[in-house]
Swiss-Prot record:
<keyword id="KW-0873">Pyrrolidone carboxylic acid</keyword>
<keyword id="KW-0345">HDL</keyword>
<comment type="similarity">
    <text>Belongs to the apolipoprotein A2 family.</text>
</comment>
<keyword id="KW-0597">Phosphoprotein</keyword>
<dbReference type="GO" id="GO:0046982">
    <property type="term" value="F:protein heterodimerization activity"/>
</dbReference>
<dbReference type="GO" id="GO:0018206">
    <property type="term" value="P:peptidyl-methionine modification"/>
</dbReference>
<dbReference type="GO" id="GO:0050821">
    <property type="term" value="P:protein stabilization"/>
</dbReference>
<dbReference type="GO" id="GO:0050766">
    <property type="term" value="P:positive regulation of phagocytosis"/>
</dbReference>
<feature type="modified residue" description="Methionine sulfoxide">
    <location>
        <position position="26"/>
    </location>
</feature>
<dbReference type="GO" id="GO:0008035">
    <property type="term" value="F:high-density lipoprotein particle binding"/>
</dbReference>
<dbReference type="InterPro" id="IPR036172">
    <property type="entry name" value="ApoA-II_sf"/>
</dbReference>
<dbReference type="GO" id="GO:0042632">
    <property type="term" value="P:cholesterol homeostasis"/>
</dbReference>
<dbReference type="GO" id="GO:0008289">
    <property type="term" value="F:lipid binding"/>
</dbReference>
<dbReference type="GO" id="GO:0032757">
    <property type="term" value="P:positive regulation of interleukin-8 production"/>
</dbReference>
<keyword id="KW-0558">Oxidation</keyword>
<feature type="modified residue" description="Pyrrolidone carboxylic acid">
    <location>
        <position position="1"/>
    </location>
</feature>
<comment type="subunit">
    <text>Monomer. Interacts with NAXE and NDRG1.</text>
</comment>
């Protein structure tokens, strides 16, 4: 069986895709001023979103782990 990608791996892949898209977009833009604004926007967005996405990933893993632990505990009678 193939391993499923981790939340961190998916988040990293998402940010890499967004970064690549931003770089491609900046190459298509000819105005240096517009390029600088776009670069600043992407950097600021990444800076602000990274902690939120990491926390959401951690919270999701903890939430799912709770249910896995419930299933593995023997039922008390």
């Amino acid at each position: 069986q193939a391993e499923e990608p981790s939340v961190e791996s998916l988040v990293s892949q998402y940010f890499q895709t967004v970064t690549d898209y931003g770089k491609d977009l900046m190459e298509k833009v000819k105005s240096p001023e517009l390029q600088a604004q776009a670069k600043a926007y992407f950097e600021k967005s990444k800076e602000q979103l990274t902690p939120l996405v990491k926390k959401a990933g951690t919270d999701l893993v903890n939430f799912l782990s709770y249910f896995v632990e419930l299933r593995t505990q023997p039922a008390t009678q």
